[in-house]
């Protein structure tokens, strides 16, 4: 944050940003200026232009960076190397670690499988999965493919899952057949039949 404050003080000297409080004040009072600068400064990979920052009004009518297109997976997977990108800790299996290089390879593999299944940009994919590394890989592959993601934890009631997924009409469903909670194996196969 100190580096960004220094950047802002040089780029916008008339805003007198010198510390956290003045940065916060600037970001609220001049939010369009702040967000436009932050988008470029942050190094987020995007296509388009950072102007305008905001269009429309009201909760449903407002568009944030309407001329910007970005891909979540592209931004998260741009880091290379063997440092840990993803760690999974579970009571049901050994702890897992996945490097950035391995994560990119796994996401690419799943993305290719999605294309082989006929998934196209804008298609919807749902997941009935817990918070495990495989879920992260699936959501990144979905994003990389340009598809839309929705998920529910397997501890949701069946009707709640059906209600959510019916709204988006997914073309593909990622799921688990069970999970472990407090040492107890929870079988999800009957829920899957209903889904």
Name the predicted role of every residue range.
Residues 28, 36-50, 66-87:
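A short N-terminal helical cap/helix-turn-helix that marks the beginning
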Residues 144-195:
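Structural core segment of the AMP-binding/adenylate-forming
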Residues 22-26, 73, 86-140, 157-162:
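Conserved AMP-binding/adenylate-forming core of the ANL superfamily
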Residues 1-60:
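N-terminal amphipathic, basic-rich helices that act as targeting or association modules
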